[in-house]
From Swiss-Prot:
Belongs to the WD repeat IPI3/WDR18 family. One of its GO terms (biological process) is DNA-templated DNA replication. This is WD repeat-containing protein 18. It holds the Pfam family WD40_alt.
Length: 428
């Protein structure tokens, strides 16, 4: 049997049989289970294709498994408080967790806590990275969505805390989900809220592109791979499909629930959504303790996978090459994660063996632009040419003097020769 190309990871609040279940979306067959505890809503993440991380529901630690050693916890990352949400950067270098109203950022290679972001006023509910790991997008119960430039966060001056690049405040009730499309710093971001709207934003400009109003609260959202459609899970158990390729007549518009644009099958609110890599299947989890696999074109449910409690996490991933091979091992060890900021009192010092390279902003004069550098270069060339010309003039003057002296000598010799010839002719 050929190895599957895609895998579905799902978790429920009960965690009686397993913390996380891995299964094949086409057949629904269970391939792996990870045991130990239960994971909080939006608290499940795959780190670098090597580790599975799950924020323990209601507890202040993160469970860590090697993808291959599913029956044994690798370690527990102790946190300052219960983990509300969790996300790993696509490049596998950073880990962020929402704890109360703060966002904690760790460096995976060293385990150092690099930053604590404190711009939200209430609990953080969802976190995600852009596909190039350059930005972090966070949503919270304070109805705010914040966009953080990762490298500006890492380069922040110690005299003041990190500040978000954008503060999107157009929602009026708690944020329930945040999803980012492809394109890195030029991607589009979809946000859903209990205010019955989903909003589409542009990271490059920070502008609101469109806002769609529903008749129910929206609890989850997902793009299809081509970003032609946006799938919105409602509190009534219905999934709504919004077309993004049609030009909106106005920036804020209502959603008209046509029969062919909805997925009906869940009996309770839809908590999480994910789309297959080829855009043909939609995976949904719900508080009705089921995960459904849908055919997007026909809007029909292909199968329903029962769970033991409300589904807290569901997402589909490209199958890691080492996930189904028990003999393989992670390519990098996971260090101990610090609870204190690097450089703070009580934090591990240099004797811990780690070296931090922090690229800070220059404190000296402002760096010149390319045009200013070009002007400076032109000025230097002009000075050089001026010096060369003055030196050349001096050389010409000196050479002229030498030639004048030689000419005088030649004239004297010519005069002497003329006088000598005249005397000879006169004597004859």
């Amino acid at each position: 049997m050929a190895a599957p190309l895609e895998l579905v990871l799902s978790a429920d609040a009960a965690g009686q049989v397993a913390n996380c279940t891995v299964w094949e979306p086409v057949t629904g067959s269970v391939l792996l289970t990870y045991r130990g505890g239960n994971t909080s809503h939006r608290g499940l993440a795959v780190l670098g294709g090597q580790y599975l991380l799950g924020g323990q529901l209601g507890k202040n630690y993160i469970n860590v498994w090697e993808l291959q050693r599913r029956d044994q916890l690798q370690q527990k990352i102790v946190c300052p408080g219960p983990v509300n949400c969790l996300s790993a950067s696509p490049n596998g270098l950073y880990l962020v967790a929402g704890i109360a109203e703060s966002i904690y950022l760790w460096e995976v290679s060293t385990g150092h806590l690099l930053a604590i972001l404190n711009s939200h006023y209430q609990d953080v509910t969802c976190l995600t990275f852009t596909d190039d790991s350059s930005h972090i997008i966070s949503g919270a119960k304070d109805s705010l969505v914040l966009v953080w430039g990762l490298y500006s966060v890492l380069q922040v001056e110690t005299s003041r805390g990190p500040e978000p690049r954008y503060v999107w405040s157009r929602h009026s009730l708690p944020i329930t989900d945040v999803q980012c499309g492809i394109g890195g710093p030029q991607a589009r971001v979809a946000t859903s809220s209990l205010d019955q709207t989903i909003k589409l934003w542009d990271i490059c400009s920070g502008d609101l592109l469109v806002s769609v109003l529903f008749d129910v609260r929206i609890t989850s959202v997902a793009f299809d791979p081509a970003e032609y459609h946006l799938f919105c899970g409602g509190s009534d158990g219905v999934i709504y499909q919004v077309d993004l390729y049609t030009t909106p007549e106005q920036r804020e518009r209502p959603f008209h629930p046509e029969q062919e644009m909805v997925f009906k099958g869940h009996r309770n609110q839809v908590t999480c959504l994910s789309v297959s890599l080829d855009g043909s299947m939609l995976i949904s989890g719900s508080h009705d303790e089921t995960v459904c696999v849908w055919d997007i074109q026909s809007k029909q449910s292909l199968r329903s996978v029962p769970h033991r409690g409300p589904v807290t996490n569901v997402f589909i991933i490209a199958a890691p090459s080492n996930m189904l091979r028990a003999e393989s091992k992670p390519s990098f060890p996971l260090p101990h994660f610090s609870k204190h900021l690097q450089g703070a009192e009580g934090c591990e010092g240099p004797e811990s063996g780690g070296v931090i390279l922090r690229l800070g902003k220059q404190q000296g004069s402002k760096e010149n632009t390319y045009l200013q550098r070009a002007d400076q270069l032109q000025s230097l060339l002009g000075e050089s040419e001026g010096k060369n010309l003055s030196g050349l003039v001096e050389q010409l003057r000196s050479r002229t003097s030498e030639l004048e002296e030689e000419l005088n000598v030649v004239r004297k010799i010519n005069k002497d020769l003329f006088d000598f010839s005249a005397r000879i002719i006169t004597k004859q």
